[in-house]
Amino acid sequence: MEKFLDINEIKKIIPHRYPFLLVDKITELEEGKSAVGYKNVTANEYFFNGHFPEEPVMPGVLIIEALAQVGAVAILSKEEFKGKIAYFGGINKAKFRKKVVPGDVLKLSIDLTKIKGVAGVGKAVATVDGKVAAEAELLFVVGK
C-alpha cells in the first residue's frame, strides 16, 4: 500500500528533529518492507558552513543518515514497532558515487531485505537526477 507522508506525519513516526531531521517527505511506503523519501538540499543547510565553505558538499555520513531515517519510517510503521526507535546496528558496503550539493533533490530509497525479531537489514540507495549518489546496506535494531 503506497502512502504519502508530509513532514508532520514523519515526525509522528521517528523522533528526529531539526537540525537532524533529514527527510522532507515520504512518497511511497509499504509498511515493514520499503519506503521512498526526499530531501531538498538547500544552501541554508547548517553543515555547509564547514563542509566546505568554498565548495559546499553534503557529508556522506548525513546522506547515510537520511537513508536510515527513511528506513526507520518503513520499519516503525509496522504495528508492532509503532512508538519505538530504530537504532543503527551497522553499515556495510557504503559507497559514495556523486557529490550532493545545494539545489539537489535527494531521492532516498530503501528496501528492507530481512527482518528477524527486532533486528533487520535494508538495501539503501540515494540518487540525484537518477544518478546514484550513495548506497549501503543498513543494519538496524528496534528499541524502546
Curated annotation (Swiss-Prot):
The lineage of its organism: Bacteria, Bacillati, Bacillota, Clostridia, Eubacteriales. The active site is at H51. Keywords: Cytoplasm, Lipid A biosynthesis, Lipid biosynthesis, Lipid metabolism, Lyase. NCBIfam families: fabZ, PRK00006.1. The gene is fabZ. GO terms for cellular component: cytoplasm; membrane. Its EC number is 4.2.1.59. Belongs to the thioester dehydratase family. FabZ subfamily. It catalyses: a (3R)-hydroxyacyl-[ACP] = a (2E)-enoyl-[ACP] + H2O. It is found in: Cytoplasm. GO terms for biological process: fatty acid biosynthetic process; lipid A biosynthetic process. Pfam families: FabA. This is 3-hydroxyacyl-[acyl-carrier-protein] dehydratase FabZ. The keyword Lipid biosynthesis applies. It comes from the Bacteria. One of its GO terms (molecular function) is (3R)-hydroxyacyl-[acyl-carrier-protein] dehydratase activity. Signal peptide: none annotated. Involved in unsaturated fatty acids biosynthesis. Catalyzes the dehydration of short chain beta-hydroxyacyl-ACPs and long chain saturated and unsaturated beta-hydroxyacyl-ACPs.
